[in-house]
């Protein structure tokens, strides 16, 4: 091992050496980035540093200069991190700005007055979200997520592809100074001066959602608050987290947190002052088991010779200016470098091979620790790390993401070739025939093989047609329609059908390759397979009532009885694009599922939001940090502020809701009248100026009726389904749920007026074609009529309907015209609503 320190390997400018706060090595191990008090990010060549450390003669003096020096920050650079895919470099500063850098492959001349730089890095994104210094940055192992933490107590999650802000957590009560990702891509952990470490679990099925898995307090109860950073590290096998600035009694230590149980049974004790940083070596090592005696028996030596186990190595450093290397097989450090720097150590970084360790300090020095081959142990291949992570459901392919446009083009080209190959192979035989009749089909296919004929040969009678005539199940063609005689599956013939194979002989005598018409295999063999009397959808009976459309469903249920007229009509409704056929329904949007959905925001609307099919403008409040509701007149004005504690993506996480409940604040005439906390996510709200109450609907189907002074007027109402819009009229409250049901209550009398009135009869009253449900209209608005205590609905197609409770149905409201003819009077009398509703 060698400890190397170069005088030029620092942030030196105008006879001053600046403190260095951060260091990181690129995934390919060729570059190392540093940042410090001078506000610059410097990129150095690792190969040049290794060559200089080896003392090679003839080394160019230009190698003593950084490859690039970027100065876009207006404050000190506190953290830099390369993305695991190597495409980006993220940097954070005390100017509260997060910059995303990318290397420009084009050659650019150096600016006036600057030294010639070998690389040019440009800012691709400038992200502003923190309210104070950014202290640490970490990327997900697949580069899909970026997390930043800072002195504003916030944890901000960014999209690693487009760098949009996904979520902001303000769960810590003090400065957040460290963050690290799980190598298995399941968790990330943060360390804060509130003397806690929080483990966040994230799910990437569809929309990314986050939950707080565990809050760890015990190792940090007496943790000092004097460190600049709390840079923690996760072991490469995913089993342990090393957290600096912990305590074990009165002694400073580094806590080792076990995965899953999240307890701390191991502490690394040895530093005289609080530690700032801990870094696991990215490689796992094999080491021989120590022999107890030097003169042991040969049998014992043979047994222990091949007995190897995996070990991980961790480096710790901090304010005592010392560096310690620990290994999992020993209780004491294997190496300690005292006073390796003159001031506190701020950051460390291993290269991907695990044989070089970079250490930065406040004395503006950068120290390199270079280890010889197998000095730390025998490193296992990098694939061995993935094998260790398999226990957590991780494989190498789970980290594969499109890295560039060229990769997407190559994948598209491969997919096109694959389709062509499948199309050419499908002309020989069908996969279903092979599965049903493997032996008989092999015999028959030999007789159906078609080879190119000579120009002198004639095409007369084909063998498959003769076989077809010999079949017991004859195909009878009558009036241009085909019929298949019903046959039991036990007595079905074994000859393969060739009705879909057409061969055309050209004038030159050559035979064109048979063209296999692309049909549904189930249609072809439906005569042989038993089917239920009522067609059951492939996705289940529940899809019949949910209105879920499945492409090709009609063709599946019509069976094999398809004639030329049906084929012509089907072909007229098909549009060919890139070799595939799409029906008229394929060009429309998919149907909406009538199920509860966890996303109810206007800005994140998806096709499976059921309420969108019913109502044009919903009453769902926005998924923002604070929503303001207003009610009343100018003289008597009321406001209600709603602060949901969690986002809609985790609205059903009870633990997160109890940790961060929804806060409700009410104001009247400049005074706060309401302050309440509800462990539910509020999605809709409305106020009544007459009865002076607020109606708040939650994501789990509850409705809270609270007065303007915060009292709960009636027990909360449980509908079991989300409310998408509320309307207040006098003392009455009318709501529409996501399943299209109306409910109405008289809040003053505390009784129900309307319940379970479905909107579907007037929405889905158009003729249904086949098995598809098509909704082309929605509700423009609805209102409550106080005189008759009923509901009136106005659709977007300028038609209005009224609910008649005594009839138990809807009635369309016709416009009244002046009576001129007797026939018109008769028509109006027949179509109008009964006399007691004539006021409408």
UniProtKB/Swiss-Prot annotation:
WD repeat start and end residues: 15-54, 72-111, 129-168, 171-210, 224-267, 292-336, 340-381
InterPro entries: CAF1B_HIR1_beta-prop, HIR1-like, HIRA-like_C, HIRA_B_motif, WD40/YVTN_repeat-like_dom_sf, WD40_repeat_dom_sf, WD40_rpt
Transcription regulation in keyword set: yes
GO MF: DNA binding; identical protein binding; nucleosome binding; transcription corepressor activity
One Pfam family matching this protein: Beta-prop_CAF1B_HIR1
Main location class: nucleus
GO annotation terms (biological process): negative regulation of chromatin organization; negative regulation of transcription by RNA polymerase II; negative regulation of transcription by RNA polymerase III; nucleosome assembly; transcription elongation by RNA polymerase II
Entry's Gene Ontology cellular component terms: chromatin; chromosome, centromeric region; HIR complex; nucleus
Keywords, in A-Z order: Chromatin regulator, Nucleus, Repeat, Repressor, Transcription, Transcription regulation, WD repeat
Subcellular locations according to the entry: Nucleus
UniProt KW Nucleus keyword: yes
Matching PANTHER family: MEMBER OF THE HIR1 FAMILY OF WD-REPEAT PROTEINS, PROTEIN HIRA
Family note: Belongs to the WD repeat HIR1 family.
Purpose of the protein: Required for replication-independent chromatin assembly and for the periodic repression of histone gene transcription during the cell cycle.
Descriptive protein name: Protein HIR1
Lineage: Eukaryota, Fungi, Dikarya, Ascomycota, Saccharomycotina
Gene name of this polypeptide: HIR1
